[in-house]
């Protein structure tokens, strides 16, 4: 059994300015996306996208993540509460974001961006998909440093006591599982897969399948939200949202493979 290390929530102090670890992780996430995006454009893997296009895409994607993530949390996790307290939807500083909602927000941004550029949606999504996992990993590291989103009780040797959980039960460090699978492993998989020419849409399909599968598996070790618990079939909300994500990616992968095989 391991003891959760108590981190100072402030990573860096610059006079009166305090930079928190969680905010620093978000900055790192977008820095990863920007630097890797520039690299892909330089390698000719961004079609006719320019560095300016990348900057615009990141800026609007941030808005999509924040707005979509917040609305996704409201609709997927606490619709009844926010129906009674609608003004609190805007209270972002109180926490409450959904990855799946943020993904929907980014998809809408990419649809509008592709239309503006006069290119296909998959030109944009295939370009951006390999850039996302390291950003996701940075976010999960921020969750771990904050001591939040801990796992279910476990007797494994690396199980960890999270004082913020309100008990002294050793638990899965599920944030680190997600950092490893949804961050590092998925990044390596997509970076390798996208390094060679693929049918349009297949890199996006691999992202949907990879994230959906990894998130579904890790949810078996992650403590369910206390206000929801487990839902139908003994699955968590995260699993129910990840299942259609995986299946959608699988269907897209098969369709793009068939379409490619028919082309001379």
From Swiss-Prot:
Topological type in the membrane: Multi-pass membrane protein
Cell compartments where the protein resides: Cell inner membrane
Pathway assignment: Protein modification; lipoprotein biosynthesis (diacylglyceryl transfer)
MF terms in GO: phosphatidylglycerol-prolipoprotein diacylglyceryl transferase activity
InterPro entries hit by this protein: Lgt
One GO term (biological process): lipoprotein biosynthetic process
EC number: 2.5.1.145
Database matches in PROSITE patterns: LGT
Broad enzyme group: transferase
One Pfam family this sequence matches: LGT
Domain of life, per lineage: Bacteria
Predominant localisation class: membrane
Membrane spanning stretches: 17-37, 57-77, 89-109, 118-138, 173-193, 201-221, 237-257
NCBIfam families registered for this protein in UniProt: lgt (TIGR00544)
Function: Catalyzes the transfer of the diacylglyceryl group from phosphatidylglycerol to the sulfhydryl group of the N-terminal cysteine of a prolipoprotein, the first step in the formation of mature lipoproteins.
Protein name: Phosphatidylglycerol--prolipoprotein diacylglyceryl transferase
Annotated organism of origin: Bordetella avium (strain 197N)
């Amino acid at each position: 059994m391991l003891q959760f290390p108590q981190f100072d929530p402030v990573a860096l102090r610059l006079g009166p300015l305090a930079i928190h670890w969680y905010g620093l992780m978000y900055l790192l996430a977008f820095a990863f996306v920007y630097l890797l995006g520039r690299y892909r454009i330089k390698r000719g893997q961004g079609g006719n996208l320019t560095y300016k296009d990348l900057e615009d895409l990141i800026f609007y994607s941030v808005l999509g993540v924040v707005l979509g993530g917040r609305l996704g949390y409201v609709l997927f996790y606490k619709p009844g509460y926010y129906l009674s307290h609608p003004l609190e939807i805007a209270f972002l500083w109180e926490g409450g974001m959904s990855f799946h909602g943020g993904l929907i927000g980014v998809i809408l941004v990419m649809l509008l961006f592709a239309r503006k550029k006069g290119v296909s949606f998959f030109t944009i999504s295939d370009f951006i998909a390999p850039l996302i996992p390291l950003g996701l990993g940075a976010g999960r590291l921020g969750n771990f440093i904050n001591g939040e989103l801990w796992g279910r009780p476990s007797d494994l040797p690396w199980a960890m006591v999270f004082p913020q959980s309100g008990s002294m039960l050793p638990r899965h460090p599920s944030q680190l599982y997600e950092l490893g699978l949804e961050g590092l492993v998925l990044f390596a998989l997509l970076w390798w897969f996208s390094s060679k020419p693929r049918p349009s849409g297949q890199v996006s399909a691999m992202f949907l399948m990879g994230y959906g599968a990894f998130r579904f598996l890790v949810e078996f070790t992650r403590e369910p939200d206390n206000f929801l618990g487990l839902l139908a079939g003994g699955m968590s909300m995260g699993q129910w949202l990840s299942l259609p994500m995986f299946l959608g990616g699988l269907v897209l992968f098969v369709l793009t493979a068939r379409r490619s095989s028919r082309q001379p």
